[in-house]
Every structure is written in C-alpha cells, then in structure tokens.
Amino acid sequence: MAKTTNGKFWNDECEKVSDLLWKPNLIVNHKPQERINFKCDNKYITFNYYSNNVPINDQLKFKDIPQSNNTDKKNKLMDKLLKIEDSRYKKDIESNKTRKIKLTKEQLTAKHNTQLLKIQNKISQLDGFIRSRRIQLLPNDFQKNIFNIWFNETTVIYNRLLTEFTQYYIKFKEIASDNKELVKLLRTNEEFPLSLQKLRNLKIHDIINIYLEDQLIHKLETPFCVIANTIKEFVANVKGNLTKLAENKIDKFTFKHKNFNGKIRTISIDSKYASENSFYPDKLGKLLQTYEDLKGFSWKNVKHDFKIVYDKYNNKYYAHIPKYVYRNLNILNKKPITVMDPGERTFQTLYGLDHVISIGDNLRETISKRLLRIDNLKSKLDTPGSKKHNLKLNRKTRVRKCRYKKAIDRHHKKIEHLQRELHYKTAIYLCENYQRIMVTDFSSKKVSSKDGDLDAMSKRILGKISHYRFRQRLQQKCEEFNCQYLEVNEAWTSKTCCNCGYIHAKLGTSKIYDCPKCKQKRDRDVNGAINILLKNRKLVLMEDQ
C-alpha cells in the first residue's frame, strides 16, 4: 500500500504519475486557439482551447477499453426464436393440407423466409440502442383540428379512469393495515383490474357510452388504438406508483388529472398505422408534411410505436419516433482521455494530457440576466394588494398580466434551449475526439441544499445548467460512439495541489490555485481536473505506473 504524504488521496503513486503529466501554469495570458471541431455557432457558448504543443508522455500506458460482447445473448435469442419459427412453420404445413384454398410450397417457403429475415433483424438490434428522434410536423388546419380532438378525448378518458381508481384507493386505504395490504387489494380488485387487457375490455364500452357523454362529446373521433394506448399509459403510471408504495419508497401518491390547457400534450400511435406519407390516412388524409421531408424522412420507415406531442408555447406539433442507433466505429485519431471538472462559473474545464479546454465561460452572466428578468416579471404579477384588486380586474389589466406570464415562459424556454444545445454539442464534441471520458459525480442537488455555502443565484444557475442531465446525455452518446464513460468521485481535488499534493485549506472561491508549498500557480479548474485523473488513475492506467 502506498504511503500517504499530503492530500486525502495523494500518495507516492500520485506523485509518480503527476511527474509524467503536462501541468500547465496560469493560462490566462495564453492565446486560445480556434474552435477545433466544436460545431456550435451560439455566441453564448464559449469554447477556448489552450495548448503548448507538448506531446503526450510515452510512459503513460492506458488500459484497453472494455468492449460489450453480445454473442451469448444473441445465440440464446436466436435459438429461442428459431425454435418458435420452426414450430410455426411445421404447423403451417400441416394445417395447409386441410385448407380449402391451399397455399403453394413456394408461398409457404416465402412466408418462412420472411419470418427468418425478421428474426435476423431482431438479433442485429442487440448491437444497437433505442433513441428517439423528434420530427416537426406541418399539419394543415383540418389535421390540427383532428389532433386537438384526439388530445381532448384522451384527456377525458384518462381523467375519468383516474377518478374511478381514486375512489377505490380511498376505500381500500381505510381497510388496509399497511401499504403492502393496500397494494394487494388494489391489484386484485376485479371491479377495476390493473391489467391492460382486462381493463381495456371492461371499460371500452363505458368510455364510448358514459365518459364522453359527460363532456358533451356525442361521437367518438379518436381511434381505438389511441384509446388503448391511453389506458396503457394510465395502467403503467399506476403500477409504477404501487410498486414504490409496496417497497415503502413513498408513503402515498397524489392523483393528478391531465390539464386540457397543458403546455405539453401527448398521444401514442402504433407503428402499424403509419402509411407511406402519413398515419391514419383515412382520418388525417394521405399526406402529412414534416419539416424533415427534405432531409429524407419517410413515414414508411417508422418501425416502432411513437408519440405525437403538441407544444402549446411554440404552437408546434412534433412526432417523437424511436429508432435503433448503432455504434459509430469509424472515427480515428482520438485522444486517449479527457478529464472534466464541472462548475458554475465555467460549465466544463477539460484536461486532455496535452491541452486544456474551457466550455461555457460566460454562462453565469447569460443565465442570471434571464433569471433576474423572470424575477422582475413575477414581482409585477405578485404586487402587494393585487389579490384584492384582481376581483375587479379590467380587460386591460388581464391582458397585461397574461403578457407577463408569456414573457416568463419565454425566458424559461430560452434558458432551456441554451442548456439543451450546450449539453448535446459538448457531448458530441467529446465523443468524437476522445476514447475515454472521465466525469465527476457533481450533484447540483447537493450543492443547492441549505447546508451549502453558495448564494441563491449560484444555486439557481446550477439548477438550470443541470450537470446531472448532462451526464445522462453524455452517457448515451458514449454508447453510440463507443467511448468509455467513467463517473468518479471528485472529493478533495480542488484543494489539493496537483504538483506536490499540498492541501490549500484557505483556497476559498479563488479562481487561481497558488500553492504555498511548491509556489506554482495554475487555474483552479485545471488543477482540479488533473487531480481527478490522479485520484482515479487506476481505472484507466496500467498497474505498473
């Protein structure tokens, strides 16, 4: 075991590896290079690349990246599906002998070959990942009206199911002695079964005859497939909460009805109803244009069930279509590793052995301006005495307050779009340029707790940046680009000197790490990123280092 010398993680091995690393001194006077391969034109997302053109030390030997092997899984699934298909094929041949209109041998063989091809496609999908693609729809007025009818009718159905289930929940809660007994009573209730097929068969006539009559909807316009998917969504939501309740992860769960005026409204569509240029062509027409038509999108290529989403704020319709994405193995000349130090002043500081990158240096200023505008607009909405005054609001005041609310939503959307672009552009850049990506378990939730020493604005900014969501998105991209994703702990990496291991107890919020022991000065975030690598070196470096 290595002997500890200074820091909480620092030892002789850390010092040995540290001597092999390029440790840049203060980079504030270095001229940043151009945006190397960073495909982002947003002026609010800065990208600064610093390098002294120092080659990576040849003595740094990295472990091989573990590759996922699905061979055993593929073989098991192949054997299972082939047995099922062989059995079906034999039964088909036997039953064909007694048919009045018999199929030819060529027809039976063609059907068998089609099934074998489907099995082969299913096996190949084990090498891929399901990802959702968002397609903007361009419906005409008639199609918009149809969508709105479907949204309203499915909302009525969902809310009525929820109301009925709530009655049983309250009834059984009074009888049950604990949560497990309550869950058992709800799951075994034959009057309101929590099986999709049973509930659908039991309630489908009530939906047609009772649910919609209460809302003065006399003719059901929504296809049965969409209604069935609404019931499926309801059952999935209830079952998920009941599982948590049985495991005592929650004490109770509230029943929230869907809002007819919600900002986001969704319905689910089965892929089998998609035609060449639309879906449900008998109801929507033979052509449903999309924003992606010029980029080669075609409805006939839709192979999985999808969702139609209406964004009320933007007044736009989208189709969220799942598809299989396979690993991109064609990118060569990647750097061996990058280590990331997250923050609030700078979104990410990257250390790549021979270069340093900072992404999102001015995000605090950009986001804080939006948040202050939101606070200002909210103060106008919640002026003292406004509750009494609101009883006799005139039309002009109502219009003004409505504009304030829209402006607040607009600022939130601007921040959300900035966050989304920042996350995805950064993730794609990392995956295209590095073999291994080391991130920290930096949690905005922990930072925003009452015990933290950050001011209120910093906590709000960290919440909007959402490092946790970025890690989720980055992990997905690492799967697609065949990169090794490493999530590690960053404790004591900021206060420890990456050159000598001294712990700077009085570092505070300083941007510069000025080591009192070895007298070296460097950027605080760069020092932290190097220490993250040193602390977790055994995950990526060979044992002899």
From Swiss-Prot:
It comes from the Viruses. GO terms for molecular function: DNA binding; metal ion binding. The keyword DNA repair does not apply. GO terms for biological process: DNA recombination; transposition. Zn(2+) binds at residues 497, 500, 515, 518. Pfam families: Cas12f1-like_TNB. Keywords: DNA recombination, DNA-binding, Metal-binding, Transposition, Zinc. InterPro entries: Cas12f1-like_TNB, Recombinase/Transposase-rel. Belongs to the transposase 35 family. This is Putative transposase R104.
